[in-house]
Amino acid sequence: MMVIAICGPTLMLMSAAMSAAADDVDLSPVIERHEMVPMRDGVKISVWTYTPPGDGPWPVVFEQRYADLRGAGTRKAAAELAGHGFVVALVNYRGTWDSEGTWVGYRTIGWGELQDGHDVCEWLATQPWSTGKVGTLGSSQGGYAQNFLAVTQPPHLVCQYMTDTGLSLFHEGYRIGGTTRPERFKSLATNCRNPADNLALLQEWDQHPDYDEYWRQEDCSLHFDKMNVPCFTIGSWYDFMNQGSIDSFVGRQHRGGANSRGQQQLIIGPWLHGRLNKGNHVGELVYPENAAWPEVPHMVRWFNHFLKEEDNGVDREPAVRYYVMGAVGEAGAPGNEWRTADDWPPAAEMTPMYFGAESTLRAAAPTAETSVSTYTSDPHRPMSIPGTAFPGATDARAFEAQSEVRTFTTDPLTTPVEWTGRIRAELFVSSTARDTDFIVRVSDVYPDGRSILIVDYPWRARYREGFDHEALLEPGEVTKIAFDVGWLSQVFNTGHRIRVTVASTGAPLYEPNPQTGGPQTIDALADGVVATNTIHHDRQHASRILAPLPVH
């Protein structure tokens, strides 16, 4: 393993379109054009192209998204990339903004009867200004779109570059950990030509609460063997979709097609979802300058190599680069450095840390015959986690002080402790309700008392046996719920403490569980019931987390 230094400016190329008017933006000498491109069923999709000056032809890079493409920031970023010798194309999904048709989510960009991404890719490849070599880029839903596109195997698709991506809308989007997220997706109506299309889509999702064939039709992880192009993937430690970014890299690297296996690269840094452009500013922390990543210069090198056959060495760089986070603002603190690896994850020994009486978190298993932590969960008065996305490195004490929340904390550390890998929770719980949620959070507690959040994840109790079927709780009966909390690479410094937090609500980030055990619909919360939930941490029911301690 080698420690490396990475620094430089960052720019999230297509992350958040500014609201400036479409006119009065000087893009010269790049030429901007608008096309309505027919799909295989005759519906026309809106495509904006940005062409470099000169005679061409040029390779093409394109992004699919549902957001407005006319913001000044988006157009300037597209023109900037075009200035490096590419035709840049921005594409709106079917039924959004200027694109015709009905918005049905990702159903028309995948491997079904309609394959809009595939059709756009091939149209771009056959234009007179195109060399026939096409690459893609995009963040978040633009990453989903790239995975969907790769499965359809367009003949002219050569490479991809994705940030904070996902593979399965069920697992990483609408039903994270089995919990529902309608409020987050209701807002997509603002992008639709017909806003009613989005409500109809959410109602359709309600008819499929479990992971069934409907959702498998939008799960790219089932089709890695069809993905057959090199891809550079950017993941973020403080991203609720980081699981998707990592799974995408691992799946393509080991189970992809012949041109995919061994040609993937991954970088994971201390960033928020879609906020790589903020550099080293994450939540309430300011990491050292080395936490920044020069995304656009690196992206240009990636596309220059694969689309222009430039031997610039980008294909020979480490398969994995990851940032080991450490204490911020403490001189000489370990961590806050980049490392490389040949694969993911690095070797680790899963080490148990047990919950105990008096809110302790210890390596020793409990010996008490009876030991519990009990709280009341009211879906109509949920605990508060502000926002609709993971808040990142923020002080969690306000959340931890709320009545429903239970914390388990180590003694101050006498030596630094590193966790690199995926944390797993194993909870023994009981409830007076037929269904409830458990949100597990991990924080780094600084000597001044700040509890800086690192990672969290929810789990709906009815899915403790798997997402393909429901298993409601028997009130009062102790049951085990085990799930992965998430990935991290963190050095907890001497004098710090490690804290695990458990709660059953955290809105609006996570939609409250009605706790009735009934159907999971948009309006189910109206019938919600109060539950008494208990975490057991005795000799026979040893609730714990498994921490990934590196094996050097």
Regions found by a protein language model. Name each.
Residues 52-125, 167-168, 173-175, 277-286, ...:
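Cap/lid segment of the alpha/beta-hydrolase catalytic domain
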Residues 22-54, 409-415:
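N-terminal cap/lid segment of alpha/beta-hydrolase-fold proteins
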Residues 207-266, 419, 491:
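Serine-hydrolase catalytic core
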Residues 63, 115, 122-191, 206-207, ...:
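Primarily recognizes the serine-hydrolase "nucleophile elbow" in alpha/beta-hydrolase
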Residues 90, 146, 159, 260-289:
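Catalytic cores of eukaryotic secretory-pathway lumenal/extracellular enzymes that build
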Residues 1-16:
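Bacterial N-terminal signal peptides
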Residues 281-552:
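C-terminal, loop-rich substrate-recognition/catalytic regions characterized by aromatic stacking residues
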Residues 137, 161-164, 234, 267-270, ...:
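Alpha/beta-hydrolase-fold catalytic nucleophile elbow
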